[in-house]
Curated annotation (Swiss-Prot):
Belongs to the EPSP synthase family. MurA subfamily. HAMAP family: MurA (MF_00111). It is found in: Cytoplasm. Phosphoenolpyruvate binds at residues 22-23. The modification 2-(S-cysteinyl)pyruvic acid O-phosphothioketal is found at residue 115. UDP-N-acetyl-alpha-D-glucosamine binds at residues 91, 305, 327. This is UDP-N-acetylglucosamine 1-carboxyvinyltransferase. The lineage of its organism: Bacteria, Pseudomonadati, Pseudomonadota, Gammaproteobacteria, Aeromonadales. One of its GO terms (biological process) is regulation of cell shape. The gene is murA. It holds the Pfam family EPSP_synthase. GO terms for molecular function: UDP-N-acetylglucosamine 1-carboxyvinyltransferase activity. It is an enzyme of class 2 (transferase).
Length: 418
């Protein structure tokens, strides 16, 4: 397995171009199953999860082409089984369920894997599709959906806010007969991006970005072109990198409006922030890093995907900061690794209390999930000495070309092939 070797005590400075958002690109790719015409996508990040999604689409019968941009044609799809071999590596594969059931009346999707940060129940997806008329059985490790004719519009009240649940049901509803209303819907920017994509293909989705979605089903969707929105979590990760190393970094081709909760906390931590329509600059030069109190919650509150990075920020700031995780259980697996580097962090249930650490020390640490791995890389830049981060296949799932981007900012990081 590949690993990263990081030489510490370095400062990140310069400009970095932000990639397209993984969490927007994946549902958009699955949404191509709703249409039998050619679709051209730009700003799709080159990531392991994107490659897995394209492989799954091809296994279902689609034709894909990658040449900088991504072209998908699903007219020849003749298979409705998303097998365990692919689904086990990526939880987002559950997003094939709604489109396959809506367009073909049949979907067999293996129960998902690919993530170690806690249970993400599929019952929300199943219950919503059942309300729309699908008959669903869970057997042999698969969710098996069958539809007699077309799905029917329904009123769906989601028990809890779920991004993938909202996305799956929204996609299915675009081809249902009648109107579907989804209450307690996720408001995340990635949900909005998916809705905008669907509307570009002829869907009728209203209310994206609010907690109530209204979808009027249409007979069919047509082909088209679409550009995936920038990755707000990648943006936030580079900004935290500048903050913890005392540097100055400008993120280009991003959208400041997508991470307001993060920017507020970075300013609270002592950073000077400037922003324009598609750029953000964070300057920490000569400034003192202060701890912050954060509590993760669904958008527009503080994102759970930035929690690990801010745990590092609090660990190296002067004073005591608190991080409360309310979205996922088991999402502090980076903490024992940071403690190995000398961080003074105490876990009390879903709260991490981060106390002033005089100096992190380089160590051999292990990545346990996507965002945890990014936090360990940032900690390595702050630490004294060298840090080895093992199992970086996690980071390759969600950060495009991360070592070269960090090298461009002055980071001393190299990939050691396994």
């Amino acid at each position: 397995m590949d690993k990263f070797k990081i030489d510490g005590r370095c400062t990140l400075n310069g400009e970095v171009t932000i990639s397209g958002a993984k969490n927007a690109a994946l549902p958009i790719l699955f949404a191509t199953l709703l249409c039998d015409e050619e679709i051209h996508l730009s700003n799709v990040p080159r990531l392991k999860d994107v490659g897995t999604t394209l492989k799954l689409l091809e296994m279902l019968g689609a034709t894909t082409k990658v040449n900088g941009n991504v072209t998908v044609l699903t007219g020849a799809v003749n298979n409705h089984v998303a097998p365990y071999e692919l689904v086990k590596t990526m939880r987002a594969s559950i997003l094939a369920l709604g489109p396959l059931a809506a367009r073909f009346g049949a979907a067999d999707v293996s129960l998902p894997g690919g993530c170690a940060i806690g249970a993400r129940p599929v019952n929300l997806h199943v219950h919503g599709l059942e309300l729309m008329g699908a008959k669903i059985a869970i057997e042999d490790g698969y969710i098996k959906a069958r539809v007699d004719g077309r799905l029917k519009g329904a009123h769906i009240l989601m028990d809890m806010v779920s991004v993938t649940g909202t996305e799956n049901l929204m996609m299915a509803a675009t081809l249902a007969d009648g109107r579907t209303v989804i209450e307690n819907a996720a408001r995340e920017p990635e949900v909005v991006d998916l809705a905008n994509f669907l509307n570009a293909l002829g869907a009728k989705v209203q209310g994206a970005g609010t907690d109530t979605l209204t979808i009027d089903g249409v007979e069919r969707l047509h082909g088209g072109s679409y550009s995936v929105q920038p990755d707000r979590i990648e943006t936030g990760t580079f900004l935290v990198g500048a903050a913890v190393t005392g540097g100055k970094v400008t993120c280009r081709k991003t959208d400041p409006s997508l991470l307001e909760a993060v920017l507020v906390k970075l300013e609270e931590a002592g950073a000077l922030i400037e922003k324009g329509a598609d750029w953000i600059t964070l300057d920490m030069t000569g400034r003192t890093l202060k701890p912050v109190t954060i509590k993760t919650a669904p958008y527009p509150a503080f994102p759970t995907d930035m929690q690990a990075q801010f745990t590092v920020l609090n660990a190296v700031a002067k004073g005591t900061g608190m991080v409360t995780e309310t979205i996922f259980e088991n999402r502090f697996m980076h903490v024992p690794e940071l403690v190995r580097m000398g961080a003074d962090i105490e876990l009390q249930g879903n709260v991490a209390i981060c106390r002033d650490t005089e100096q992190l020390k380089g160590a051999q640490v292990m990545a346990t999930d996507l965002r945890a791995s990014a936090s360990l890389v940032l900690a390595g830049f702050v630490a004294e000495g060298s840090t080895i981060v093992d199992r970086i296949y996690h980071i390759d799932r969600g950060y495009e070309d991360i070592e070269h981007k960090l090298q461009g900012l002055g980071g001393c990081i190299e990939r050691i092939k396994g």
